[in-house]
């Protein structure tokens, strides 16, 4: 398995997994080196996309692992890789959010993320929990 920065030829595969932003924005994120992919040989089986909250704080926007690869530690590997890169880039902490009713919150808490607040977006039925991790 390999974790690498996404490039333009990965765009269509990434769009398949990332329906949280408009497909035109995916190319922009790739260009700005904000997307990592997990590859099994040449096949993309995971995607991690982030942005900069307030243009200064790395914020995880998406972590997706193909269903056949879940529960095998690849999500943890992608998170650790991203955190390592952010540390190298001299960031002191990273942030993310997930819905209160999603099991992902337990995954992030096991990785050392701590809850720093929550809000209820009008389009959701559950609170969106904000997390922070010191690097």
Feature map (PLM): residue ranges:
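Conserved short alpha-helix immediately C-terminal to the canonical SAM/SAH-binding motif I
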Residues: 78, 102-104
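A short, internal acetyl-CoA/4′-phosphopantetheine-binding micro-motif in the GNAT/acyltransferase core
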Residues: 63-70, 99
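Acetyl-CoA-dependent GNAT
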Residues: 1-61, 66, 85, 121
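Conserved acetyl-CoA pyrophosphate-binding loop and the N-cap/start of the following alpha-helix
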Residues: 69, 73-81
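A general lysine-centric signal
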Residues: 133-134
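Conserved active-site tyrosine of GNAT-family acetyltransferases
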Residues: 108-109, 113
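Conserved catalytic-core motifs of GNAT/GCN5-like acyltransferases
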Residues: 95-97, 114-130
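Conserved GNAT acetyl-CoA-binding A-motif
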Residues: 86-98
